[in-house]
């Protein structure tokens, strides 16, 4: 994916999207922005938009709620003076992401709840750390080392995001991590052998840190004892760059570094094909409004009620193994997100199954298209497809992965 596009091409794109002159200018400026990686840091040094004020890095811990079993759930809030992240020990969940727009107006741009019962009883996975296996496994079944394992079915006839009680519904242990460059929390959960049908005792630590340049870095680390297992950890944060509950994301502009994707069947299970995006509604190689082709009659869009597909990330990795997966921007207010990862795929979900029944923070109803998710990952149902990258983790091996959400404005 090119670091910038010719201005004439950007203006043609803006015209196709029905954007006005001001929005077209914002689109042009954002498209011309470049991103580089600071040597040895593994985090992007943004060359566009407002740069973060080097404010004081702060973190605080407060009680949030208590589970029915009497286990305390805490909320950690950490900030660099410009961007503020709130996370729960329940599900190692991102509850809030507060960022300014180009005028300095701060909004929460992530979906979430303000009470524990909604997180516990409902299943939208708002902001949750997902495991032991993110995304779908066909019929909840896979075979490893000659043994067939069954995961509880919770999504049609398939298993989704680790089964009926995944890592999103566990209380994680938390430890503050802070130095002179970043601040955040390391969350740890030990999943016993056989939990949700998965083999092996899996110890997972997921560390969320915010640096002075508005980069939210997620470092995943896992080891297994006793038996081999499968692992696919991710985070299911939902974003709306207008601010949560402030309208749809259909006018958000997306540029994806993904020349291919994995088509699915009617149950949203990959067919095994790795198909080119060229000539399809899945081609976001140039900046395109999310809603432009969303309601087309392409079979894949019909299956997902929109976008709910794994994209195969392209391009070359930097010295830290990271590749740019995609860029989002909202031209009216100017907020942007760039996502870097070392994972082979990313699930782009356009909020198709939000139906107004979820009342989020401030009692706002979340409706179809009110947010998007961008989940870095190995491919869905990988254990049942030999041509997909392996998700097997064996005793003595270490699972490591990094994803960075870089917030900005233009």
Locate predicted features.
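An exposed, glycine/acidic-rich loop-and-rim segment of catalytic or binding clefts
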Residues: 2-4, 42-410
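N-terminal secretory signal peptides and thylakoid transit peptides that target proteins
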Residues: 1-18
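Bacterial N-terminal signal peptides
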Residues: 18-25
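Signal peptide processing junction and immediate N-terminal pro/mature segment
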Residues: 27-40
């Amino acid at each position: 994916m090119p670091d910038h596009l010719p201005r004439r091409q950007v203006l043609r794109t803006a015209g196709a999207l029905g954007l006005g002159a001001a929005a077209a200018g914002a689109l042009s400026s954002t498209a011309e922005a470049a991103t580089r990686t600071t040597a040895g840091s593994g985090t992007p040094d943004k060359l566009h938009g407002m740069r973060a004020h080097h404010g004081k890095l702060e973190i605080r811990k407060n009680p949030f709620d208590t589970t029915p079993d009497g286990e305390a759930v805490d909320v950690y809030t950490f900030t660099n003076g410009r961007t503020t992240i709130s996370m729960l020990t329940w599900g190692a969940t991102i509850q809030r992401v507060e960022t300014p727009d180009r005028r300095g107006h701060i909004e929460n741009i992530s979906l979430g709840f303000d009470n524990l019962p909604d997180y516990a009883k409902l299943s939208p996975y708002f902001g949750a750390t997902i495991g032991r296996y993110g995304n779908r496994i066909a019929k909840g079944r896979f075979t490893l080392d000659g043994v067939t394992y069954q995961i509880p079915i919770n999504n049609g006839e398939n298993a989704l995001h680790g089964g009926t009680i995944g890592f999103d519904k566990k209380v994680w242990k938390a430890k503050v991590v802070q130095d002179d460059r970043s601040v955040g929390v390391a969350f740890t959960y030990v999943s016993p052998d056989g939990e949700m049908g998965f083999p092996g005792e899996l110890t997972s630590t997921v560390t969320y840190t915010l640096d002075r340049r508005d980069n939210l870095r997620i470092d995943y680390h896992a080891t297994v004892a006793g038996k081999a297992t499968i692992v696919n950890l991710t985070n299911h944060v939902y974003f709306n760059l207008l601010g949560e509950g402030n309208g749809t994301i259909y006018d958000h502009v997306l540029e994806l570094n993904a020349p291919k994707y994995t088509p699915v069947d009617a149950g949203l299970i990959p067919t095994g094909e790795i198909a080119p995006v060229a000539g399809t509604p899945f081609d976001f190689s140039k900046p395109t409004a999310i809603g432009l082709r969303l309601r087309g009659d392409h079979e894949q869009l019909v299956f997902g009620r929109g976008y709910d597909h794994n994209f195969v990330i392209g391009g070359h990795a930097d010295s830290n193994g990271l590749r740019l997966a995609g860029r989002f921007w909202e031209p009216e207010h100017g907020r942007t997100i760039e996502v870097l990862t070392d994972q082979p795929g990313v699930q782009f979900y356009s909020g198709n199954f939000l139906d107004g029944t979820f009342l989020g923070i401030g009692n706002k109803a979340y409706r179809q298209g009110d947010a998007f998710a961008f989940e870095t990952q190995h491919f869905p149902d990988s254990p049942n497809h030999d041509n997909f990258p392996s998700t097997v983790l064996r005793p003595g091996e270490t699972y490591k992965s990094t994803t960075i959400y870089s917030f900005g404005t233009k």
